[in-house]
Amino acid sequence: MASFRSSLLSALCAYGMMVMPAYAIDPNHPKLHHHKYSERLKKRHTEDSYLSSSSTLESSKTFAQEPRRHVLTPIRNVLADRPCEEGLSISKLFNSIEKETNSQISVDFTILPQWFYPKKGLLKAVDEKQPTWQFYVSPNVSWQLYNSPTAGVGSIDFSYTLVRYWRNNAQNANNAIGIAGGINDYSTRTNTLSQLTFSQTFPENILTISFGQYSLYSIDGTLYDNDQQSGFLSYALSQNASATYSSGSVGAYLQFTPTPSINIQAGFQDAYNVSGSSFDLYNLTRNRYNFYGYVSWAPQSSLGSGQYSALVYSTRKVPEQPVQTTGWSLNFGQHLGEKLYVFGRWNGATGTVTNLNRSYVLGLASANPINRNPQDLLGAACSMSKVNPKVITEKKIRKYETVIETFATIGFGPHISLTPDLQIYIHPARRPDKRAAKVYGVRANFST
């Protein structure tokens, strides 16, 4: 069995190296439609777009001259590029690997200290330790195995989320200031296999089928309200605050893209793996599945590009999440000229899984506003969320909780950025004695 797997992998590698240069980007992530992990890869390649295209052309010529290569040739060529000749250069190493394997690789590392007020909970006598220190690492890989006019494109996509805390965690901060949401997207330590899929895109790039582990978080949102590492920090503005779907689970989905501006998906997942902490094929035999449908329209107008999407999903009752739910999420994002981007979201879910069962979001962002650095970004947004009284058991709670957040990302070269961030919670749901709560943070990003 081991010999068979080794032979199969060698064959896929060899075949992929012979035919892969036909596309620069995998078509299973449509260019005009938001995909959380694809955006990370796209961001990593923005600075090197010219180099990538020239490398692709050069590779095409090389492959035309050498239609057959040994499976170890990419390793030899990476070493021949000498990425560490003038000191260790992670970017140069990744560029060499990408060129030889027709893959895209990014690693994002974030350090996030956050200070919060009030400092102690309603019935607590001691202040919580400040600040909370969050460390967030997210590697992402997209590898094109093969590409031919008759077989189409086959690719493997991988993304992992690793979150750790030092001194104190965000859950204790949430309790101290009395909010039903969260001061960031991951309140405690997290290990999540967000994506590990094989995708087959058929000729004409209209139909794609994907198998493996994936999460709806990757498509549920727009450019800046769906990723704590690059946009807003607060729970209600960095994701769907009422989401009850899995953080990553095994299943499959079918994607139909009749035109570049239309993307339609339908799929299912194992219902048992709610946290996405493992990759478990056995759960598919236990006859509990979650289902979803998704439609996205990305018009191109004189004002700029936009995206309007709708997601509907249902989850089954399992021991890990003992409530059956139905949820929805409506999103829009629209560029208004070169520098201004407006976005919004309305989402909700039934059941008693989350603290918030409705959320309304409206915001704006301006990328590189003074043409100083491509990483520069200004953002301001507001979210009003309805509190789920069946989940929060305090005797006195507010029905709604509102957060206003603003941030400014300052880029230092292509790989480092700092983001001062301010969150103001108006009428925190679990602190009826407080009119407002405040959270200050500084996000430091290191990306390859």
From Swiss-Prot:
- Give a yes or no for keyword Secreted in this entry: no
Location in the cell reads: Cell outer membrane
Record field: transmembrane? none
Q: What keywords are assigned to this protein? A: Amino-acid transport, Cell outer membrane, Ion transport, Membrane, Porin, Signal, Transmembrane, Transmembrane beta strand, Transport, Virulence
A single Gene Ontology biological process assigned to it is: carbohydrate transport
| Membrane topology, record value | Multi-pass membrane protein
Where in the sequence is the signal peptide annotated?
1-24
> GO terms for molecular function, please?
porin activity
Checking Pfam families in the record gives: OprB
Do the record's keywords include Phosphoprotein? no
Q: Which InterPro entries match?
A: Carb-sel_porin_OprB (IPR007049), OprB_sf (IPR038673)
One cellular component term from this protein's GO annotations in UniProt: pore complex
Q: Which Gene3D superfamilies match?
A: Carbohydrate-selective porin OprB (2.40.160.180)
Q: Please give the family membership noted in the entry.
A: Belongs to the OprB family.
The function of this protein is: Facilitates L-arginine uptake, as part of the AaxABC system. The arginine uptake by the bacterium in the macrophage may be a virulence factor against the host innate immune response.
Q: Can you name this protein?
A: Porin AaxA
List the source organism: Chlamydia abortus (strain DSM 27085 / S26/3) (Chlamydophila abortus)
